[in-house]
Amino acid sequence: MATLNQGSLSLLLISCVLGASVSVPASAEDGIIVTGRNVQGFMVGRPSFGKDPYPSTANANPSQQILRATGGELSDNDFAGVSSGSTITRAILPNGDLPGLSNTLGNNSAGLGAGAAAGHASGNSLGGQISGSIERGLAPLNNIGAMMGVQP
């Protein structure tokens, strides 16, 4: 096994410094990020078809409209004026719930499936309906856990 002497170590150090100083810095193009590209197969010995002419891309550069609208950095008032979207339920859905998907069963509360859903949904909101659906869907797993002796 060869040992390194002082001359070879200094030569290695100098070559690393020179290599790092003359390396080309990494640079991106104009902010276009390629998120997906179709790979086109080709036979060995034949030239490739080239890059995908229609790659899936995203443009990271802000457009001139955005730059003009913001006028620079966003302030606290800009963030305070953003709506949470909570009023869209009243604007799109009648009475705030989806017709036909409400949790109220009318006068007959012992209808089909009422035993599985009784008391599990919280109100007439869409969130309550989704929560009730998830609980009904997970009921078989809860039953398996009860058979195994796991207490909820």
Curated annotation (Swiss-Prot):
Keyword Chaperone: yes
GO cellular component, one term: periplasmic space
Keywords recorded for this protein, A-Z: Chaperone, Periplasm, Signal
Disruption phenotype: Deletion of just fapA in an overexpressing strain yields less dense fibrils around the cells. Deletion of the entire fapA-fapF six-gene locus shows no visible growth phenotype.
Chief location: periplasm
Annotated signal peptide: 1-28
Superkingdom of origin: Bacteria
Record's subcellular location: Periplasm
Family stated for the protein in its record: Belongs to the FapA family.
Oligomeric and partner information: Monomer in solution. Interacts with FapC but not FapB in vitro.
UniProt function note: An intrinsically disordered chaperone for fibril amyloid FapC that guards against fibrillation, probably within the periplasm. FapA inhibits FapC fibrillation and elongation of FapB fibrils in vitro. Upon overexpression of the endogenous six-gene locus (fapA-fapF) in situ, cells form large clumps during liquid growth, make large amounts of biofilm and produce amyloid fibrils. Expression of the 6 gene operon in E.coli strain BL21(DE3) induces flocculation and biofilm formation with copious extracellular fibrils.
Domain notes per entry: Soluble monomeric FapA is predominantly disordered.
UniProt protein name: Functional amyloid chaperone FapA
Lineage: Bacteria, Pseudomonadati, Pseudomonadota, Gammaproteobacteria, Pseudomonadales
Name of the encoding gene: fapA
